[in-house]
Each structure stands twice: as C-alpha cells, then as structure tokens.
Amino acid sequence: MNQWMELANRVLAGAEVTDEEALSILHCPDEDILLLMHGAFHIRKHFYGKKVKLNMIMNAKSGLCPENCGYCSQSAISKAPIESYRMVNKETLLEGAKRAHDLNIGTYCIVASGRGPSNREVDQVVDAVQEIKETYGLKVCACLGLLKPEQAKRLKDAGVDRYNHNLNTSQRNHSNITTSHTYDDRVNTVEIAKESGLSPCSGAIIGIKETKQDVIDIAKSLKALDADSIPVNFLHAIDGTPLEGVNELNPLYCLKVLALFRFINPSKEIRISGGREVNLRSLQPLGLYAANSIFVGDYLTTAGQEETEDHKMLSDLGFEVESVEEMKASLSAKS
C-alpha cells in the first residue's frame, strides 16, 4: 500500500492531516500523481461514491464594486473591459433557473458584485427565490457579499439554501490581495450565514501569489469554519487587473491542490470552480477523483466550457450526475 492510500485510510479513521503531510501532498513527485489521486478518490468515494454535483452561476449584478480585490475584474481598481449592470430583474433570474433545471443542474447560484447587498437588492433576490423554489425546486445559493444578520434571515426564510462567501486565501496573505475589507469580515459573514441556518459555502483562489503554506492554511481554516461546500478556484488572470499576467499554476499542481483539500476536508463538497479550463486543461477529468462538484457554463466575467462537453467528460469517466430530483430528495431529507 502506498503512502497516499495509507494517509487516506488514516483520514477515514478520523486522523487530522498534519502540516508536514500536507506539504508532502503539494510536493508529490509528478510521476506519482496517479497514486495521490487514487488516495484522494478513496476518500471521495467513501462519502460521495461516483456522484457529481452540478452548479450554475447567474451573474445577477456585474461590476460597480467599490472593493480593491487584486484578482477581480469587477473591482474599483480594475481596468478590465467588462460589462457592468445593476441587479437584473426577476424574469432574468427565473430564466436562469429554468435553464439550470432543463440542463439537470441541481444548484443555482445567484451572484452579485459589491461589498454587500442593499436591502432593496435582498428584496429582489427574495422575491425571485420564492418563485424559483415553487416552480423548479432547485437548491439556491446566494453570493451577495458581506451580509447582515437580518438579511441572512430574510434569505433563509425565502428559501435560499446556501450562502457563499469565500475566504479566498490565508489570513496571512489576505492584505496582499485586498485592503478594503479584512479577513475577519469574511469569516464573520460565513458565521452570520451559519447562524441563520444557511448552509455555509466558502472557498479559496489558488495562484494569487500565495505560498504552499498559505494553501495549507486556507484549507485548514475552511475545515475549522466547517464550510459544507468548498469551491476551489484557480486564478484566471484577467488583463486590466493588478494580477494581469500572473501565471504560477500548472495542471499537475492544481491536481495536488484538489487532493490536499480532499484530504483535509474529507466529507465536504469540494467544487472545481473558476479557472479550471485554463489551469487544469486536459487534466480536468482527473480533478474529479478528488472533487465531487463542478460549475457548468460560464463564470462571472469569463467563459466556461460548453455544458455538453462537461456532460461528455462525466460520462467518459463513468461518473453519475446528481439529478435535480436527487438533489430535491436530499434537501427534503435535511429539512
């Protein structure tokens, strides 16, 4: 039995991954990558079998953000030529939900740019979500920025299932990425979501000039935060942002990162998120031996892979999509 399968068995028995073991994952020799992914899949299969959860993003409000996040094309300091618009109307949100439902995508993510939502924007989301739940029964995730307790309660009462607010990077590296809000601001929003009964979703961006120790620290911080769903983004450097031209990643390292997140957060939904197409490239299928969830379609301001290609990839792997009906049943079981 190789060292990664031994570690996987210890993790399944309840052991915590040490920093030394975590570093060994990130330093795994490239020629041993299949052994590492086999260990990660041993854990993934224990909790999720061969099921894959599908998610779709609706960019409900674009640009116009006062924050100074260095990776983001929508920030106040970005010069990227993106489309900017205020919160879309209810009909547009419903059209997106119908598309997700028709494509058998179980989770619909409503994402809005900005520091945090106004009460009016919360009103708009609440109004749409109530009809989305009645008509399509999708799992709804909201990602609206820094959240107040009363706003979180309104979202929960309307039927929102999950709230996303990424920590993005380690506490140590956070001020290198943005200074317009703190790491603790982000943690606080996730805690507010949890306290309101929303399922917490929080993840990371890899490739933003962090160290390997930063990657380990963010994976462990998300474990401590007990995030149910962990999106792992890989930087897609956009021209006009401070991180323009940064390209520190390669496909094999991205696989090691996904394996690390699975070993540290064994039972959680690990989602391959933004940047998978440009960073994992032809090795995208291997990522699903560690992760059990992907975004389908376009991201916020960058294009994703065609939905049909994602379905072909999953079929070729012998994996099974968690259907909308299966997702509905799992939500009913939790309620």
Swiss-Prot record:
Chain positions recorded as [2Fe-2S] cluster binding sites: C109, C141, C201, R271
GO biological process: biotin biosynthetic process
Pfam families, sorted: BATS, Radical_SAM
Residues covered by the Radical SAM core domain: 47-276
Manner of cofactor binding, per the entry note: Binds 1 [4Fe-4S] cluster. The cluster is coordinated with 3 cysteines and an exchangeable S-adenosyl-L-methionine.
Binding site for [4Fe-4S] cluster: C65, C69, C72
Reactions catalysed: (4R,5S)-dethiobiotin + (sulfur carrier)-SH + 2 reduced [2Fe-2S]-[ferredoxin] + 2 S-adenosyl-L-methionine = (sulfur carrier)-H + biotin + 2 5'-deoxyadenosine + 2 L-methionine + 2 oxidized [2Fe-2S]-[ferredoxin]
SMART domains per the UniProt record, alphabetical: BATS (SM00876), Elp3 (SM00729)
Known partners and oligomeric status: Homodimer.
Full protein name: Biotin synthase
Biological source species: Bacillus subtilis subsp. natto
Gene: bioB
